[in-house]
Amino acid sequence: MGYSESRSESVSSKGKTSYGHELETVPLPEKKIYTTWPDMIRHWPKTTLCIVSNEFCERFSYYGMRTVLTFYLLNVLKFTDSQSTIFFNGFTVLCYTTPLLGSIVADGYIGKFWTIFSVSILYAIGQVVLALASTKNFQSSVHPWMDLSGLLIIAFGTGGIKPCVSAFGGDQFELGQERMLSLFFSMFYFSINAGSMISTFISPIFRSQPCLGQDSCYPMAFGIPAILMIVATLVFMGGSFWYKKNPPKDNVFGEVSRLMFRAVGNKMKSGSTPKEHWLLHYLTTHDCALDAKCLELQAEKRNKNLCQKKKFIDDVRSLLRVLVMFLPVPMFWALYDQQGSVWLIQAIQMDCRLSDTLLLLPDQMQTLNAVLILLFIPLFQVIIYPVAAKCVRLTPLRKMVTGGLLASLAFLITGFVQLQVNTTLPTLPEEGEASISFWNQFETDCTITVMSGIHKRVLPHDKYLHEDKKNKSGIYNLFTTKSPAKGNGDWTLTYDLSYDGACGDTSKLEKTVKVTAKSKKIIYVGVGSFGYYQNTANTDKPTDGTGEFSMGIVTVFNSSYGGNFAMCRQNTSDFDVNHPCNPRHPADFYFWETDYNSHTDDRDQNATITGSLSSQPAVTYKQKSVKPGYWQLYYLLNTPKDVDRQTYNKTATLVAPTNYGFHRVKQGGVFIYALTGTYENPKIHELQIVQSNSVSILWQIPQIVVITAAEILFSITGYEFAYSQSAPSMKALVQALWLLTTAAGDSIIVVITILNLFENMAVEFFVYAAAMFVVIAIFALLSIFYYTYNYYTTDEEDGEIGVDDEEEIEDHNPRYSIDNKGFHPDEKDTFDMHF
């Protein structure tokens, strides 16, 4: 047959509890438990397909937006790495705190169905607000308040849905369908990751496309998720006539809170009788004759000895046992949820090239997690779990402990990857220190010797001092200096220069250079026939996430020019040698303009040239991110890009050549181009301040594989554990509290980031790995010595247990227990009973 019959003996009409109290008859219903695939498919609640489809669309919407959110914070709202991490994970905290409100509304007021429908509309509104905000450029006054308002609405929307959808799906199953319920949670999680897989792959593509005059398209990346959220709402409503809609009964959270407060109050009163459990003190002042629920239950069951509050206390006690097991869980989420923030920032620092023409976008690495989830779910269900079960009894808590250990391993791997990434990052001076670079900008073959006390550096033509971690000779190392006084103020340094080669009349050249050092900064000093000048280097790597390098411009002409510049791609399909620059193709045109978009100026600062016969300053232009390719630098003779008018086409864009071009495929480097000599025939010098990324982004694959396996073992099992181990009256509340552990985990990330405890990301990853190992060890101990499995079904019939009017009740309610070997191992094995 396609099913087995589960027969459980009824408690005798005068049975005893573990405390010796008499019980009424407890009939356990006889149900068919379907075990074969044909029978499970035939008896499957079809309405759950609408729920799973809704979850797919909603997760597509959420993850599609969330995938590109960090880049949006970095590049549109102009937040720093730390600020982006704080806001990203802070948003996640809110998304996983608001489920508590959703649970209260669903259980106590309008039910799960109407809660899901109502907040879905709110959710869609938030997505639309965020999409509209993203249509404005970064200088618009709508930022950041409109963006953050949209995110706030989204957080309340997704939070209201989270505790209800999975629980609402579980409500569609009946006693005897436990195997189907377990498969439903796997299907549910599969739909989550199918939606996230597709969205995390295509949202970065939407983001990277030029639109609305920008070289990225966040309106598309946010707009399509908004559309999918509307679709999710419609799909959910499609099954509204066939859902099993359990009516709301009470505000369970409020009732639990009132019960606890009264129990504590009664316990604190002098002369209170000791109880087996502190919650039982609630019954000290409870009178069934004055309680509407007790009277209703007694009338329904025709038994004046029944007490609704005694059963409810039993439910709350089971809730507290589960919540104790939740205490170590936030640490797992503190690791797992760094994929969208800290791991993404790590990916930005890596080489995304699969070839010279093919890029794997950093935010697309999150797609691998979703793809692996889809592969791992059947792999674990069909192969790994059955094979492992032949060697060891598999229980939810054992799976979760294993998942926690794998999460620790994932961050150990991440730390070692970061150690390699660090070799391409700039080593910034410590507090009270500065690094000084000299840059030979002679137009001729002149060698400069720089002396600082006993330290000497020799700079041939076009060379510069820089940090090269791969070159052990140190012949071009930066000068490092410490402040002579305590504090972070500026201080002055003196260097002696000598010249050799085709340097012209050396008697007119500066022999002594005075440099103003700044704490924690890298200062570069340009030296040439014009004299010398100094600037503070911007060491920030580009964060656009589409393979960019960063470049700035300095003009040191012997005549006046402080106008516009443009970088124009030379290998486009429609390239016109007579009109080489097309401002209407943002990915092929980068510009530095001096007065545009309501008086925006891309000139960063003017540096005084010492020793120059001319009064012209060295004009410095801001660093901008440029995509890889074939580029030519031009003087831009008008202002084609301005918010007050339509962008010029290529024929209206006036340019003059500098006769300097290059081909660059590497990403992540930070460059400055100095133009010296004459405007008509400039000599261009290149200074690379920060190395290009050299560690392949593919090295993130091992850590993603391991964290995904951890997710399978911890998160899916946790969903099932939270649902199955709670009494029917507590299911939505327990789901909300399970989600609240994610909020607590992300709060850990936010607090650590705010405290700025780690300068080195690798050290931070190792600390997280160690913390996870310690916490999961505590979790294992709780599993072994504290928790005993108790499996509840969704078939709730209040008050089938009658308890005489006593102050104590048993801590385990046999009415809700069934013989499920996954949760109730052989009682002779005490260890397995717990862990």
Curated annotation (Swiss-Prot):
Tissue expression from the record: Expressed specifically in the intestine.
Region (Disordered): 814-835
Keywords: Cell membrane, Membrane, Peptide transport, Protein transport, Transmembrane, Transmembrane helix, Transport
Compositionally biased intervals (Basic and acidic residues): 821-835
Membrane topology: Multi-pass membrane protein
Knockout consequences: Mutant worms have decreased body size, high fat stores, increased uptake of fatty acids, reduced brood size, retarded postembryonic growth, extended reproductive life span and increased resistance to stress. RNAi-mediated knockdown of the protein results in impaired synthesis of long-chain and polyunsaturated fatty acids. Pharyngeal pumping rate is similar to wild type but simultaneous knockdown with nhx-2 results in reduced rate of pharyngeal pumping and slightly higher acidic intestinal pH.
Subcellular location: Apical cell membrane
Signal sequence segment: none
Gene Ontology molecular-function annotations: dipeptide transmembrane transporter activity
GO BP terms: determination of adult lifespan; dipeptide import across plasma membrane; dipeptide transport; intracellular amino acid homeostasis; L-amino acid transport; lipid storage; negative regulation of fatty acid transport; nematode larval development
Record-level GO cellular component terms: apical plasma membrane; plasma membrane
InterPro entries: MFS_trans_sf, Oligopep_transport, POT_fam, PTR2_symporter_CS
Membrane-traversing stretches: 86-106, 113-133, 150-170, 183-203, 222-242, 325-345, 368-388, 401-421, 697-717, 738-758, 765-785
UniProt main location, coarse: membrane
Annotated function: Low-affinity peptide transporter that is necessary for proton-dependent uptake of di- or tripeptides, and to a minor extent tetrapeptides, in the intestine. Transport is independent of sodium and chloride ions. Controls the uptake of dietary fatty acids, plays a role in fatty acid synthesis and is responsible for dipeptide-induced acidification of the intestine. Regulates cellular pH differences together with the antiporter protein, nhx-2.
UniProt record similarity statement: Belongs to the major facilitator superfamily. Proton-dependent oligopeptide transporter (POT/PTR) (TC 2.A.17) family.
Full protein name: Peptide transporter family 1
Species for this entry: Caenorhabditis elegans
Protein encoded by which gene: pept-1
